[in-house]
């Protein structure tokens, strides 16, 4: 049963353009922000969930608070859906599947292309929304919007190139034909660190193949998901093809279980922690779902004695400090040959010192806050453990004077394998430098990770 008229959301009114006073109001933590005033297209700001093409409130009429990690500002009160709503979203996707799968590839590609164009046209607003709820600098957010849009563009074209095959038959009087068809209803559970790109990377191939999808965005960053879903609607994506199920951390656990255990859902894609990935895999096992799990990372960065040190430092800066180190593919362990160790540490520290910390909406800021208190506490534990076991603090190593969840970009030298930071994913702006002498040994060290 789908949403009744009483559960439909209220259409936002057109509001004035941004003024300095509007911007300053965003930093007043005592009141709910007026985000539409910051946007050229205020309709992008959505607080209700999307099921079967309708913007709905939660069936239990509950909401959860979304905060700006840079200021503590209350941004939005988003619909806090429950398991009944999750079942409704799955049903909507199931009903929409036949018609969407039945459309010719060119039609699906055309709708997706229109969606891509709308994302580009609203890129500035989408970047503002992302910076507000996630904290990353505006330039990084804009880059992610473009990166996320590229998935839609790519798979819009690939939709027209889904081809089967006619392999040689083992029987002379028979012909073997291989057809590629949409698997069915898909689920995407997405992270907060890349709240647009990780959604489009999952939605776009599913849509191109003819699948419908239910998306459960991270509770910290639902506004970006709702905004791009609105643009999908505007592009002509039929009702039920994309469904957004928003929920807080408590409801998310129960909703995740429903999505995993539903026999209607044929494929589940998840980007997040290894711990949660294990749970989702176990919950999906009874229905033998296809799974795509992108879990934790602990990537090594190796600098040999014949390396161009300036180039190595430049690469390290991009790899380590993007998104305040909150990236599953960023470098977490810096193995540096003893012959170039000191000069590398010196130059890396100098480059790190130039990073400007602050609100991602402010001019010139290159590192925003960590997403929440839990994140910054983990960074503090890793740094404290390393120093207690003999690591040398070169720069940073503490919370910023800005307060909140800002943490100074940090370089540690003299790190060794006894420290948690070498075996666990820190997910923060800390570069631990580990000296090595033997090339064969460092390759073994680089590969000695439970994360692969």
Stretches with model-predicted labels:
Residues 164-311, 436:
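Rossmann-like NAD(P) dinucleotide-binding subdomain of oxidoreductase/dehydrogenase enzymes
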Residues 65, 79, 101-102, 134, ...:
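A structural signal for short, well-ordered beta-strand elements
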Residues 234, 251, 275-416, 438-447:
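ALDH superfamily catalytic-core signature
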Residues 1-78, 110, 114, 164-189, ...:
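Terminal low-complexity tails and localization/encapsulation signals of metabolic enzymes
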């Amino acid at each position: 049963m789908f949403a009744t008229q009483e559960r439909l959301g209220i259409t936002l009114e057109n509001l004035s353009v941004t003024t300095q006073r509007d911007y300053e109001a965003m930093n007043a933590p005592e009141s709910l922000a007026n985000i539409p005033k910051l946007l050229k297209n205020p309709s992008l700001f959505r607080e209700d969930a999307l099921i079967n093409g309708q913007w709905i409130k939660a069936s239990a009429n509950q909401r959860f608070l979304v905060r700006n990690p840079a200021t503590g500002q209350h941004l939005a009160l988003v619909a806090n859906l429950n398991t009944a709503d999750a079942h409704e979203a799955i049903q909507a996707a199931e009903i929409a599947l036949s018609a969407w799968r039945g459309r010719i590839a060119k039609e699906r590609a055309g709708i997706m292309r229109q969606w891509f164009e709308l994302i580009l046209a609203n890129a500035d607003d989408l970047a503002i929304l992302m910076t507000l709820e996630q904290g990353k600098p505006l330039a990084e957010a804009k880059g992610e919007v473009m990166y996320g849009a590229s998935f839609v563009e790519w798979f819009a074209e690939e939709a027209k190139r889904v081809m089967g095959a006619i392999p040689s038959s083992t029987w002379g009087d028979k012909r073997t034909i291989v057809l590629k068809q949409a698997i069915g209803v898909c689920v995407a559970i997405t992270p907060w660190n890349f709240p647009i790109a990780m959604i489009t990377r999952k939605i776009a191939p599913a849509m191109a193949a003819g699948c419908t999808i239910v998306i459960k965005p991270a509770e910290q960053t639902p506004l970006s998901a709702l905004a791009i879903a609105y643009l999908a609607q505007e592009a002509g994506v039929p009702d039920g093809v994309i469904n957004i199920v928003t929920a807080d951390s408590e409801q998310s656990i129960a909703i995740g279980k429903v999505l995993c255990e539903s026999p209607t859902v044929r494929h589940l894609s998840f980007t997040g922690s290894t711990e949660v990935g294990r749970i989702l895999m176990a919950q999906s096992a009874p229905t033998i779902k296809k799974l795509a799990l992108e879990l934790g990372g602990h990537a090594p960065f190796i600098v040999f004695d014949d390396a161009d040190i300036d180039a190595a430092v430049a690469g390290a800066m991009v790899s380590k400090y993007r998104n305040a180190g909150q990236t599953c593919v960023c470098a977490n362990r810096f193995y540096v040959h003893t012959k170039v160790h000191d000069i590398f540490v010196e130059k890396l520290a100098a480059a790190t010192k130039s990073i400007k910390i602050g609100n991602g909406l402010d001019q010139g800021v290159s590192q925003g806050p960590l997403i929440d208190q839990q994140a910054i506490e983990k960074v503090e534990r890793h740094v404290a453990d390393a120093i207690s076991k003999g690591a040398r603090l070169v720069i940073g190593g503490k919370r910023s004077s800005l307060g909140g969840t800002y943490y100074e970009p940090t370089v540690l030298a003299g790190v060794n394998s006894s420290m948690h930071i070498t075996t666990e994913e820190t997910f923060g702006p800390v570069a631990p430098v580990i000296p090595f002498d033997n090339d064969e040994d460092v390759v073994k060290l680089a590969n000695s990770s439970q994360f692969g």
